């Protein structure tokens, strides 16, 4: 992994992420396939980017007995940078359906 990354930046080098990126960049990928691969890529990104999220214990009732599991310790906000980041939201929400979604707008000359 490159050592010159800024603090807080994670470079995901998982083979499945690399494959999905290759498929996204391929000129032969049509719009339907592009959206499907982007959804898959964002799901993989969520798994990697949430690796160190704090959790807290929570007790639930199973059909047989109480069970102590884990829940997120704090609320999570997904904030895609408009407009390109919007395509990543669906895959993220598939794993984190209760998060808040904010939006960041940026432009360039």
Language-model features: locations:
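PRPP-associated nucleotide enzymes
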Residues: 1-109
């Amino acid at each position: 992994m490159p050592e010159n990354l800024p603090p807080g930046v994670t470079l995901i080098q998982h083979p499945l992420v690399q494959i999905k990126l290759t498929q996204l960049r391929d000129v032969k990928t049509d719009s339907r396939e592009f959206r499907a691969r982007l959804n898959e890529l964002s799901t993989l990104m969520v798994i990697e980017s949430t690796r160190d999220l704090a959790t807290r214990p929570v007790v639930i009732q199973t059909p047989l007995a109480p069970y102590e599991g884990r829940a997120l310790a704090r609320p999570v906000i997904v904030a895609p940078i408009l407009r390109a980041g919007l395509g990543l939201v669906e895959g993220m929400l598939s794993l984190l359906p209760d998060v808040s979604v904010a939006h960041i707008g940026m432009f360039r000359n």
